[in-house]
Amino acid sequence: MALKAVCVLKGAGETSGTVHFEQEDN
C-alpha cells in the first residue's frame, strides 16, 4: 500500500493523494 501511495503522489498530486489517504484510513 505504501508503494502505491508514493506512485499516486508522484503521478497525480494533491487530489489523488487525498483520495489515497482516505482509502488507507478505511
Curated annotation (Swiss-Prot):
Its EC number is 1.15.1.1. It comes from the Eukaryota. Its cofactor is Cu cation; Zn(2+). Coiled coil: none annotated. Keywords: Antioxidant, Copper, Cytoplasm, Lipoprotein, Metal-binding, Nucleus, Oxidoreductase, Palmitate, Zinc. Its main location: cytoplasm. It is found in: Cytoplasm; Nucleus. GO terms for molecular function: metal ion binding; superoxide dismutase activity. Signal peptide: none annotated. GO terms for cellular component: cytoplasm; nucleus. Belongs to the Cu-Zn superoxide dismutase family. Destroys radicals which are normally produced within the cells and which are toxic to biological systems. This is Superoxide dismutase [Cu-Zn]. It comes from Paralichthys olivaceus (Bastard halibut). The gene is sod1.
